[in-house]
């Protein structure tokens, strides 16, 4: 979003939905979902804005809270402010976008068709692991992919080193993103 001065700022918006409880009595009234938004760079009182919304939904500081996010640093910082039981879940849209970029970079990184096909199979396996909820194995696979890209970068010489180098950096960044 752009303000009047011409600088950029980031808006964080969310919807707080109370969790489902199987053991809740049938006559218990469900709490409605509530929305919140704030501009992180301009709002130094995050706890005064967000925690009352969470508290109105029945949240206590020692309870588990799950945030679905794009994985940006601002949301990761938000987790540390909410409480020790806060957890981040990456949304599939942003994960799939990053995987698509890695696939395209892999196709152009190396003239060796065998290496490229093997890495594309690795990315398909990584995608499968993520889709099926095997986060720890997916992080290991992403780190292995980054190592393979690094190996290709080391073997290349001159101008040919640039594409594997970019692939290695992107793969390493993706592994960090998943952590």
Where are these regions (language model features)?
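Catalytic center-proximal scaffold of phosphoryl-transfer enzymes
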Residues: 1-179
């Amino acid at each position: 979003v752009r303000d009047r001065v011409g600088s950029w700022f980031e808006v964080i918006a969310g919807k707080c939905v109370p969790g489902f409880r199987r053991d809740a009595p049938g006559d218990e009234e469900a709490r409605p979902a509530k929305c919140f938004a704030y501009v992180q760079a301009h709002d130094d009182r995050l706890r005064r804005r967000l925690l009352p919304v969470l508290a109105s939904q029945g949240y206590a500081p020692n309870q588990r809270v799950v945030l679905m996010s794009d994985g940006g640093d601002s949301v990761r910082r938000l987790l540390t402010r909410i409480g020790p039981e806060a957890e981040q879940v990456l949304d599939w849209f942003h994960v799939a976008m990053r995987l698509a970029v890695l696939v395209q970079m892999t196709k152009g990184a190396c003239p060796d068709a065998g290496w490229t096909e093997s890495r594309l199979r690795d990315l398909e396996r990584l995608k499968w692991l993520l889709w099926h909820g095997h986060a720890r194995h997916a992080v290991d696979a992403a780190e292995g992919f980054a190592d393979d890209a690094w190996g290709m970068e080391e073997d290349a010489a001159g101008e040919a080193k640039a594409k594997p180098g970019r692939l290695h950096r992107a793969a390493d960044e993706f592994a960090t993103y998943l952590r």
